[in-house]
């Protein structure tokens, strides 16, 4: 019997994502000037106000207020009528020095002995139902909002869009977990009050999103996914009515509140730890990336069609407490999942320092992760510029989304005789 599965996404202008991007922009600036910085940075955004809090151990000094303002402006909050914009909002920072009690557990005599920054469990997931080994409902939800943001920035085909938006996609699956069709799509987008007649305004928004946005999204999809779109999709466009008041003025945003959007859209599992605002000594972040790296490479190597990988750590201890694997009965090798987990520990070093080194996590690569998902993104190298209050600037080429590389596939094929 078929079933329905749903995932959601939120845009870069969603209040929680504004907070995530501010936190990760600050992380990037610390790492750009001192790669060994230890940083935990939380942000709260609300009407006309940003509050920063956290703990830092670093050799560099930053103008965090300026970084926050620049990030807000880049997202698109640049007008006073939004009641939250980068030029006029207040920015209060209470960031202070990291606790020595915590630092003692992380810093060791040799980098290899670096302990985990906290206890916790982290998961990685991958499936072969999309080309980037991500769950389809989440992938489509992200793509809808990325295309909507592109339309907003182009300011041509649709000229009334504001930064805050959300999407949700429901897919019908067969009883053997094959996507059959898209059942429903929900899109809520903030907009200017461009017509006095609210009904006419909402009709215009619905028409534009169905006839401009959706065709642009579909055109960029593989043919195997395009065929899932049909004339019977149940669309809900701004179902509550007008959405003029939005962003941090409409809802308070906090760092780390969109952890399911950030990962797998409800597929697989989540250990509960957020990513944004944390340097890579925090295994909530680094180990979750490592688990995705392992899971994606396992599926790409043909070991299985779907996999969930878990790792656990104790604070101050380098070696993981354990590794767990679930292939959901899709493995193409004659090994039980426990044996696959054991081979993983032989295949890759999961100590925090080894993860940081392998995935190049001590680089300023995190702002780009803070919207539209940390997983399933395109591995690429970009040029980024960073500035200090004293006028010093640094231009860097950094490699983004290293955990999406498939360079572990040959070793997996050898280890499992694939």
Task: Identify the residue ranges that each predicted region occupies.
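N-terminal, positively charged regions that mediate nucleic acid binding
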Residues: 1-40, 45, 155, 409, ...
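Glycine-rich, mobile lid/loop segments that gate access to catalytic sites or pores
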Residues: 6, 48, 66, 73-77, ...
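Conserved phosphate/anionic-ligand binding catalytic regions in large, soluble enzymes, centered on
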Residues: 8-10, 14-19, 114-130, 244-269, ...
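Alpha-helical support elements that line or immediately flank enzyme active sites
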Residues: 12-31, 129-148, 278-302
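A short glycine-rich, hydrophobically flanked beta-strand micro-motif that places a catalytic Asp/Glu
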Residues: 37-41, 165-171, 233-237, 303-314
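Short, charge-patterned binding micro-sites
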Residues: 39-59, 315-319
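Internal helix-turn-beta structural module
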Residues: 46, 306, 313-418
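Glycine-rich anion/phosphate-binding loop at the beta-strand->alpha-helix junction
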Residues: 196-300
């Amino acid at each position: 019997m078929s079933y329905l599965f749903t995932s959601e996404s939120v845009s870069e202008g969603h209040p929680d994502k504004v907070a995530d991007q501010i936190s990760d922009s600050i992380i990037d600036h610390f790492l750009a000037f001192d790669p060994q910085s230890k940083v935990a940075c939380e942000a709260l955004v609300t009407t006309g106000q940003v509050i920063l809090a956290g703990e830092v151990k670093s050799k560099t000094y930053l103008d965090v207020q300026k970084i926050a303002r620049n990030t807000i402006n880049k997202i698109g909050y640049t007008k006073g009528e939004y009641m939250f914009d980068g030029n006029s909002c207040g920015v209060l920072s209470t960031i202070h020095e990291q606790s020595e009690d915590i630092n003692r557990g992380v810093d060791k005599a040799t980098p290899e002995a670096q302990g985990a920054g906290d206890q916790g469990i982290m998961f990685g997931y991958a499936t072969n139902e999309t080309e980037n080994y991500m769950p389809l409902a989440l992938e489509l939800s992200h793509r809808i909002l990325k295309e909507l943001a592109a339309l907003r920035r182009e300011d041509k085909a649709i000229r009334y869009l504001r930064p805050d938006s959300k999407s949700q996609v429901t897919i019908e699956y067969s009883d053997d977990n094959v996507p059959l069709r898209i059942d429903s799509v929900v899109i809520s987008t903030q907009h200017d009050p461009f017509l006095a007649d609210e009904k006419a305004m909402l009709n215009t928004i619905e028409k534009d999103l169905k006839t401009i946005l959706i065709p642009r999204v579909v055109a960029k999809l593989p043919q195997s996914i395009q065929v899932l779109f049909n004339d019977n999709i149940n669309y809900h466009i701004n179902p509550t009515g007008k959405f003029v008041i939005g962003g941090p003025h409409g809802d308070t945003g906090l760092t780390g509140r969109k952890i399911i959007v950030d990962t797998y859209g409800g597929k697989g599992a989540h250990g509960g730890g957020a990513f944004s605002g944390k340097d890579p000594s925090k295994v909530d972040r680094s180990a979750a990336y490592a688990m995705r790296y392992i899971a994606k490479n396992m599926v790409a190597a043909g070991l299985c069609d779907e996999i969930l990988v878990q790792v656990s750590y104790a604070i101050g201890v380098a070696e993981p407490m354990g590794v767990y694997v679930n292939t959901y009965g899709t493995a193409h090798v004659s090994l039980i999942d426990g044996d696959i987990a054991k081979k993983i520990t032989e295949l890759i070093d999961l100590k925090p320092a080894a993860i940081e080194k392998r995935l190049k996590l001590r680089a300023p690569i995190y702002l780009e992760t803070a919207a539209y998902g940390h997983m399933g993104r395109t591995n690429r190298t970009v040029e980024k510029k960073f500035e200090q209050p004293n006028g010093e600037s640094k231009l860097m080429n950094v490699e983004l989304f290293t955990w999406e590389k498939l360079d572990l596939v040959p070793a997996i094929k050898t280890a499992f005789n694939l």
